[in-house]
Design a protein with these regions (language model features):
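ATP/NTP phosphate-donor binding region
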Residues: 1-59, 234
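Charged helix-capping and loop-helix junction motifs
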Residues: 51, 110-113, 231-237
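Short acidic, glycine-rich surface-loop motifs adjacent to enzyme active sites
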Residues: 62-77, 213-226
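Short beta-strand segments
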Residues: 70-72, 95-98, 132-136, 197, ...
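Accessory alpha-helical/coil subdomains and C-terminal extensions
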Residues: 15-25, 141-225
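A glycine- and small-aliphatic-rich helix-loop capping segment at beta-alpha/alpha-beta transitions
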Residues: 2-14, 76, 82-95, 110-116, ...
Length: 238
Protein backbone atom coordinates (compact mmCIF):
# COMPACT_ATOMS: atom_id res chain seq x y z
CA UNK A 1 0.00 0.00 0.00
CA UNK A 2 1.15 3.53 -0.77
CA UNK A 3 -0.05 6.87 0.59
CA UNK A 4 -0.84 9.79 -1.72
CA UNK A 5 0.96 12.69 -0.05
CA UNK A 6 -1.52 15.26 -1.40
CA UNK A 7 -4.82 13.56 -0.60
CA UNK A 8 -3.82 11.14 2.15
CA UNK A 9 -5.54 8.30 0.27
CA UNK A 10 -3.89 4.91 0.77
CA UNK A 11 -4.22 2.43 -2.08
CA UNK A 12 -2.42 -0.59 -3.54
CA UNK A 13 0.56 0.05 -5.80
CA UNK A 14 0.99 -1.69 -9.14
CA UNK A 15 2.70 -4.60 -7.42
CA UNK A 16 3.47 -5.79 -3.92
CA UNK A 17 6.47 -3.68 -2.74
CA UNK A 18 7.77 -6.62 -0.70
CA UNK A 19 8.46 -8.71 -3.80
CA UNK A 20 11.70 -6.89 -4.58
CA UNK A 21 13.13 -8.03 -1.24
CA UNK A 22 12.41 -11.74 -1.78
CA UNK A 23 15.90 -12.53 -3.20
CA UNK A 24 17.49 -11.36 0.06
CA UNK A 25 15.84 -14.29 1.85
CA UNK A 26 16.95 -17.09 -0.44
CA UNK A 27 19.88 -18.06 1.78
CA UNK A 28 17.60 -18.81 4.72
CA UNK A 29 14.31 -19.99 3.25
CA UNK A 30 12.88 -21.02 -0.09
CA UNK A 31 9.89 -18.76 -0.73
CA UNK A 32 7.07 -19.59 -3.12
CA UNK A 33 5.19 -16.37 -3.88
CA UNK A 34 1.54 -16.39 -4.90
CA UNK A 35 -0.29 -13.09 -5.44
CA UNK A 36 -3.85 -14.16 -4.60
CA UNK A 37 -5.55 -10.79 -4.14
CA UNK A 38 -4.42 -7.24 -4.81
CA UNK A 39 -6.99 -5.13 -3.01
CA UNK A 40 -7.36 -2.94 0.10
CA UNK A 41 -8.36 -4.86 3.21
CA UNK A 42 -11.74 -3.06 3.61
CA UNK A 43 -12.68 -4.78 0.34
CA UNK A 44 -12.15 -8.25 1.85
CA UNK A 45 -15.27 -10.36 2.32
CA UNK A 46 -15.85 -13.85 3.74
CA UNK A 47 -15.79 -15.12 0.14
CA UNK A 48 -12.16 -14.04 -0.30
CA UNK A 49 -11.34 -15.44 3.13
CA UNK A 50 -12.79 -18.80 2.11
CA UNK A 51 -10.74 -18.70 -1.09
CA UNK A 52 -7.60 -18.21 0.99
CA UNK A 53 -8.49 -21.17 3.17
CA UNK A 54 -9.02 -23.42 0.15
CA UNK A 55 -5.74 -22.31 -1.44
CA UNK A 56 -3.76 -22.89 1.76
CA UNK A 57 -5.11 -26.39 2.37
CA UNK A 58 -4.68 -27.36 -1.29
CA UNK A 59 -1.08 -26.11 -1.46
CA UNK A 60 -0.15 -27.89 1.75
CA UNK A 61 -1.46 -31.18 0.34
CA UNK A 62 0.18 -30.79 -3.08
CA UNK A 63 3.52 -29.16 -2.27
CA UNK A 64 6.28 -29.62 0.27
CA UNK A 65 5.37 -26.51 2.26
CA UNK A 66 6.50 -26.01 5.84
CA UNK A 67 4.85 -22.66 6.56
CA UNK A 68 2.59 -19.96 5.14
CA UNK A 69 2.81 -16.16 5.40
CA UNK A 70 -0.14 -13.98 4.37
CA UNK A 71 0.41 -10.24 3.89
CA UNK A 72 -2.79 -8.34 4.60
CA UNK A 73 -4.07 -4.82 5.16
CA UNK A 74 -4.65 -4.14 8.83
CA UNK A 75 -8.26 -2.90 8.66
CA UNK A 76 -9.65 -6.44 8.43
CA UNK A 77 -6.53 -8.43 9.27
CA UNK A 78 -7.96 -9.79 12.51
CA UNK A 79 -11.15 -10.92 10.75
CA UNK A 80 -9.27 -12.83 8.06
CA UNK A 81 -6.87 -14.33 10.60
CA UNK A 82 -9.74 -15.52 12.79
CA UNK A 83 -11.68 -16.93 9.83
CA UNK A 84 -8.61 -18.90 8.74
CA UNK A 85 -7.99 -20.00 12.32
CA UNK A 86 -11.46 -21.57 12.37
CA UNK A 87 -11.35 -23.16 8.92
CA UNK A 88 -7.81 -24.09 7.82
CA UNK A 89 -7.21 -27.80 8.42
CA UNK A 90 -3.42 -27.73 7.95
CA UNK A 91 -1.36 -27.71 11.15
CA UNK A 92 1.83 -26.14 9.73
CA UNK A 93 2.71 -22.60 10.86
CA UNK A 94 0.36 -20.06 9.26
CA UNK A 95 1.13 -16.40 9.90
CA UNK A 96 -0.78 -13.25 8.95
CA UNK A 97 1.11 -9.96 8.95
CA UNK A 98 0.72 -6.39 7.72
CA UNK A 99 1.98 -2.85 8.15
CA UNK A 100 0.75 0.22 9.97
CA UNK A 101 2.78 2.59 7.81
CA UNK A 102 2.56 2.65 4.03
CA UNK A 103 5.58 1.52 2.04
CA UNK A 104 6.42 5.11 1.00
CA UNK A 105 6.13 6.56 4.52
CA UNK A 106 9.08 7.34 6.77
CA UNK A 107 9.58 4.44 9.17
CA UNK A 108 7.55 1.98 7.08
CA UNK A 109 7.21 -1.26 9.06
CA UNK A 110 5.99 -3.60 6.33
CA UNK A 111 9.32 -5.20 5.42
CA UNK A 112 10.34 -5.73 9.03
CA UNK A 113 6.99 -7.33 9.90
CA UNK A 114 7.23 -9.49 6.78
CA UNK A 115 10.70 -10.75 7.72
CA UNK A 116 9.48 -11.44 11.26
CA UNK A 117 6.51 -13.38 9.90
CA UNK A 118 8.80 -15.49 7.70
CA UNK A 119 10.95 -16.29 10.75
CA UNK A 120 7.89 -17.46 12.67
CA UNK A 121 6.46 -19.45 9.75
CA UNK A 122 9.79 -21.26 9.32
CA UNK A 123 9.95 -22.14 13.02
CA UNK A 124 8.90 -25.71 13.83
CA UNK A 125 7.61 -24.63 17.23
CA UNK A 126 5.00 -22.42 15.53
CA UNK A 127 3.14 -25.48 14.22
CA UNK A 128 -0.15 -26.64 15.73
CA UNK A 129 -0.81 -23.27 17.37
CA UNK A 130 -3.58 -22.17 15.04
CA UNK A 131 -3.21 -19.10 12.86
CA UNK A 132 -0.77 -16.54 14.24
CA UNK A 133 -0.61 -12.77 13.78
CA UNK A 134 2.89 -11.26 13.77
CA UNK A 135 3.56 -7.52 13.90
CA UNK A 136 5.85 -5.27 15.92
CA UNK A 137 7.99 -8.19 17.20
CA UNK A 138 4.96 -9.82 18.83
CA UNK A 139 3.25 -13.13 18.08
CA UNK A 140 -0.48 -13.28 18.80
CA UNK A 141 -3.12 -15.99 18.44
CA UNK A 142 -5.81 -15.14 15.91
CA UNK A 143 -8.34 -16.25 18.52
CA UNK A 144 -7.52 -13.35 20.84
CA UNK A 145 -5.91 -10.57 18.81
CA UNK A 146 -7.62 -7.30 17.92
CA UNK A 147 -6.65 -3.96 16.41
CA UNK A 148 -6.75 -1.36 19.18
CA UNK A 149 -5.56 1.85 17.49
CA UNK A 150 -5.97 3.36 14.04
CA UNK A 151 -2.30 4.19 13.45
CA UNK A 152 -0.04 3.04 16.30
CA UNK A 153 2.47 0.37 15.22
CA UNK A 154 1.70 -1.51 18.45
CA UNK A 155 -2.00 -1.60 17.63
CA UNK A 156 -2.45 -5.38 17.58
CA UNK A 157 -3.03 -6.62 21.11
CA UNK A 158 -4.61 -9.61 22.83
CA UNK A 159 -6.55 -8.11 25.77
CA UNK A 160 -6.41 -10.22 28.95
CA UNK A 161 -4.10 -12.73 27.24
CA UNK A 162 -1.16 -10.89 25.70
CA UNK A 163 1.14 -12.22 22.96
CA UNK A 164 2.12 -15.89 23.03
CA UNK A 165 5.64 -15.18 21.83
CA UNK A 166 8.21 -12.70 20.59
CA UNK A 167 10.51 -12.31 17.60
CA UNK A 168 14.00 -11.35 18.76
CA UNK A 169 17.40 -10.92 17.11
CA UNK A 170 18.31 -14.37 18.39
CA UNK A 171 15.21 -16.06 17.06
CA UNK A 172 11.58 -16.87 17.80
CA UNK A 173 10.54 -17.39 21.41
CA UNK A 174 7.18 -18.81 22.55
CA UNK A 175 6.27 -18.46 26.21
CA UNK A 176 2.75 -19.92 26.21
CA UNK A 177 0.11 -21.34 23.88
CA UNK A 178 -3.63 -21.84 23.54
CA UNK A 179 -5.06 -24.62 25.68
CA UNK A 180 -7.72 -25.50 23.12
CA UNK A 181 -8.03 -25.02 19.36
CA UNK A 182 -10.68 -26.37 17.00
CA UNK A 183 -11.51 -25.98 13.31
CA UNK A 184 -14.64 -26.34 11.21
CA UNK A 185 -15.11 -27.65 7.69
CA UNK A 186 -17.15 -25.31 5.49
CA UNK A 187 -17.64 -25.29 1.72
CA UNK A 188 -19.37 -21.97 1.17
CA UNK A 189 -20.28 -18.71 2.87
CA UNK A 190 -23.81 -17.82 1.82
CA UNK A 191 -25.75 -16.66 4.90
CA UNK A 192 -26.47 -12.97 5.47
CA UNK A 193 -25.96 -12.15 9.15
CA UNK A 194 -26.35 -8.61 10.54
CA UNK A 195 -24.19 -7.41 13.44
CA UNK A 196 -25.56 -4.71 15.77
CA UNK A 197 -23.93 -2.99 18.71
CA UNK A 198 -26.20 -2.12 21.63
CA UNK A 199 -25.90 1.30 23.23
CA UNK A 200 -27.51 3.27 26.05
CA UNK A 201 -30.98 4.48 25.05
CA UNK A 202 -31.19 2.19 22.02
CA UNK A 203 -34.72 1.56 20.74
CA UNK A 204 -36.02 -1.00 18.26
CA UNK A 205 -35.78 1.21 15.13
CA UNK A 206 -32.89 -0.72 13.59
CA UNK A 207 -34.31 -4.08 14.62
CA UNK A 208 -37.69 -3.19 13.11
CA UNK A 209 -36.02 -2.21 9.84
CA UNK A 210 -34.12 -5.49 9.73
CA UNK A 211 -37.38 -7.43 10.00
CA UNK A 212 -38.16 -6.51 6.39
CA UNK A 213 -34.72 -7.39 5.03
CA UNK A 214 -33.57 -10.78 3.67
CA UNK A 215 -31.31 -11.64 6.59
CA UNK A 216 -30.61 -15.09 8.02
CA UNK A 217 -29.65 -14.00 11.51
CA UNK A 218 -28.73 -11.17 13.86
CA UNK A 219 -25.80 -10.95 16.25
CA UNK A 220 -26.14 -8.29 18.94
CA UNK A 221 -23.13 -7.06 20.89
CA UNK A 222 -25.07 -6.49 24.08
CA UNK A 223 -24.32 -4.54 27.26
CA UNK A 224 -22.82 -6.09 30.39
CA UNK A 225 -23.54 -9.80 30.54
CA UNK A 226 -26.01 -9.84 27.66
CA UNK A 227 -28.30 -7.00 28.72
CA UNK A 228 -30.28 -4.78 26.33
CA UNK A 229 -32.23 -1.51 26.71
CA UNK A 230 -35.93 -2.33 27.25
CA UNK A 231 -37.11 -0.47 24.12
CA UNK A 232 -35.33 -3.01 21.90
CA UNK A 233 -37.44 -5.89 23.17
CA UNK A 234 -40.67 -5.47 21.13
CA UNK A 235 -38.92 -6.19 17.83
CA UNK A 236 -36.90 -9.03 19.33
CA UNK A 237 -40.03 -10.65 20.71
CA UNK A 238 -41.66 -10.53 17.27
Amino acid sequence: MEEDKETGVVQPGEKNPLLKFIPDLEGDVDLIVEDVFHLPSPHMTPSEMLQLQVIIDERVKQDNIHGVVITHGTDTLEETAYFLDLTVQATIPIVVTGAMRSSNELGADGLYNFLSAVKVASCDEAAEKGVLVVLNDEIHCATNVTKTHTSNVATFQSPQYGPIGMVTKRGVVFHHALVHHETYTINKVSKNVVVLKAYAGMDDTLLAAIENLPVDGIVIEALGQGNLPPRTLPSLER
